[in-house]
Amino acid sequence: NSVHPCCDPVTCKPKRGKHCASGPCCENCYIVGVGTVCNPARGDWNDDNCTGVSSDCPPNPWNGKPSDN
């Protein structure tokens, strides 16, 4: 078994001082900055961008549509 550099193997949570262990918006144990593209635009859809507060990549809207639709 290898030890994950970001995750405490006992608690299964990020180690002290680390913010995340995995995800498209997590890099080197830290959440990437707001606006970082985590899924490039395709067709009529906009880029998906990191929020700066989560390691998940939230879906962005279709071009011209508000994000709460």
From Swiss-Prot:
Keywords: Cell adhesion impairing toxin, Disulfide bond, Secreted, Toxin. SMART domains: DISIN (SM00050). It is found in: Secreted. It comes from the Eukaryota. Disulfide bonds join 6-29, 20-26, 25-50, 38-57. A motif (Cell attachment site) lies at residues 42-44. SUPFAM superfamilies: Blood coagulation inhibitor (disintegrin) (SSF57552). GO terms for cellular component: extracellular region. One of its GO terms (molecular function) is toxin activity. Expressed by the venom gland. InterPro entries: Disintegrin_CS (IPR018358), Disintegrin_dom (IPR001762), Disintegrin_dom_sf (IPR036436). Its main location: secreted. Residues 1-65 form the Disintegrin domain. The disintegrin belongs to the dimeric disintegrin subfamily. Heterodimer with subunit alpha; disulfide-linked. Belongs to the venom metalloproteinase (M12B) family. P-II subfamily. P-IIe sub-subfamily. This is Disintegrin EC6 subunit beta.
